[in-house]
Amino acid sequence: MAQNDSQEFAELWEKNLIIQPPGGGSCWDIINDEEYLPGSFDPNFFENVLEEQPQPSTLPPTSTVPETSDYPGDHGFRLRFPQSGTAKSVTCTYSPDLNKLFCQLAKTCPVQMVVDVAPPQGSVVRATAIYKKSEHVAEVVRRCPHHERTPDGDNLAPAGHLIRVEGNQRANYREDNITLRHSVFVPYEAPQLGAEWTTVLLNYMCNSSCMGGMNRRPILTIITLETQEGQLLGRRSFEVRVCACPGRDRKTEESNFKKDQETKTMAKTTTGTKRSLVKESSSATLRPEGSKKAKGSSSDEEIFTLQVRGRERYEILKKLNDSLELSDVVPASDAEKYRQKFMTKNKKENRESSEPKQGKKLMVKDEGRSDSD
């Protein structure tokens, strides 16, 4: 049987199934011969392929350290949070003073997105978590090993991702090929009729105090509005703390924040007062002696008003002011004569008051002692 097969193969080989071109040319000549090509074949097909140059990627380069500053962009992108108090029963609350979100593990956190101008069709909203402090910002924020092994039920998101999107089946979870950072994005949806914002529900799947995870290191959540190709249209960020009692922690941190602000304000006021006093003392020290005004004279014509509490003080200050006004009017020579006359009159009155009346002799202490002796 095998021998018959080999004979048939040899006969086929001898017949040479490859079509030989007329004239004994090469088989490649058939390709160049238009007789053997279909009528729809484009002879410039390969030239067009070679002339096409590779186009650069429209995706922006990935940054090792993501930017956290607010960027509303041309569309006026910004965030809002529902108002909530500091009661112990709240599961999610936002502090405008701190720009910080306090929430419980795996609880719903509504984030409202507002734009002034609608973004292009197909735009997406992305949420990324990074560490706030510079010494930790290069590390990837991920769940602790304990919560990572805990089944979540839906299995839609990778186990290591901290941020989840609730109630949206179109959420896409990504891990960057270069930085390995985790992010989740959803298609941007225009606000519903009568509403000004679009709401996205976020879940944080690990506590801030978990060992092996965030380990009490503060984190930021960056919300970006991007085109379908990854071009940035807007960016906002806020701090997040995942804890057991969000209301209590918010109240405590806001109280500490206000105390720090008051301390800084008092320190600035004290520093400014000290600087002004030092400046005045230095200017007084550097002032030449010749610039000092002579006592008893005043060439300043500016008038001031002084408010005094109490009639007695007013009379004293009035007499003092009248004396100063009189000294400015009376010449110095006449003032000296009046002063001498006043002193002489006072001495005479003192001498008369010291003499005893009705001829009685004033007993001196030493004289009385000598008589007794």
UniProtKB/Swiss-Prot annotation:
Region (Transcription activation (acidic)): 1-31
Gene Ontology MF terms in the entry: DNA-binding transcription factor activity; DNA-binding transcription factor activity, RNA polymerase II-specific; metal ion binding; molecular condensate scaffold activity; promoter-specific chromatin binding; RNA polymerase II cis-regulatory region sequence-specific DNA binding; sequence-specific DNA binding
Residues annotated to bind Zn(2+): 144, 147, 206, 210
Gene Ontology cellular-component terms listed: chromatin; cytoplasm; mitochondrion; nucleus
Region (Basic (repression of DNA-binding)): 345-366
Subcellular location: Cytoplasm; Nucleus
Result of knocking out the encoding gene: Morpholino knockdowns show a decrease in apoptosis in response to UV irradiation during late blastula stage embryos (4hpf). Loss of mdm2 transcription increase in response to UV irradiation. No effect on expression of perp in the eyes, midbrain and gut at 36 hpf. Decrease in endothelial cell apoptosis in the absence of blood flow. In double morpholino knockdown of tp53 and yju2, tp53 deficiency rescues animals from developmental neurodegeneration observed on yju2 mutants and radiosensitivity.
Cofactors demanded by this protein: Zn(2+)
Family from the record: Belongs to the p53 family.
Domain notes: The N-terminal and C-terminal disordered regions undergo liquid-liquid phase separation (LLPS) following homotetramerization and activation. Post-translational modifications, such as phosphorylation or lactylation affect the ability to undergo LLPS. The nuclear export signal acts as a transcriptional repression domain. The TADI and TADII motifs (residues 17 to 25 and 48 to 56) correspond both to 9aaTAD motifs which are transactivation domains present in a large number of yeast and animal transcription factors.
Name of this chain's protein: Cellular tumor antigen p53
Gene that this polypeptide is encoded by: tp53
